[in-house]
């Protein structure tokens, strides 16, 4: 949950692109932990997204909403890190923050089931 705190810190400072980056990484770390716990290999960020979808969303173990949250954060992080004209605002961060926390909680629940 430290990475969520980093997102909050960046949000408070007005660094919304950085906040979205930290929200993504908080979810990425949680998703990676789930995959590792289940001995599912993923070597890239795209691989984590693909494996999560294939093994958990498509099988119904993870809601479509959580899958969509991770995909949206993946896209926003890509854009904010690699595009010259990407702009995240407070409204976006405020929308994504609770969704990211819910995603992380879902990862934790799935890990504890295994």
Residue ranges of each PLM-predicted region?
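Terminal alpha-helical segments
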Residues: 1-114
């Amino acid at each position: 949950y430290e990475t969520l705190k980093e997102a909050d810190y960046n949000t408070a400072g007005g660094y919304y692109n950085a906040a979205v980056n930290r929200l993504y990484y908080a979810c990425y770390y949680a998703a990676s932990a789930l995959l590792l716990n289940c001995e599912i290999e993923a070597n890239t960020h795209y691989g984590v997204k693909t494996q999560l979808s294939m093994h958990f969303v498509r099988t119904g173990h993870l809601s479509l909403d959580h899958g969509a949250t991770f995909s949206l954060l993946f896209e926003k992080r890509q854009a904010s890190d690699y595009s010259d004209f990407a702009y995240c605002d407070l409204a976006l961060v405020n929308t994504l923050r609770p969704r990211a926390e819910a995603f992380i909680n879902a990862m934790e629940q799935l890990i504890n089931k295994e």
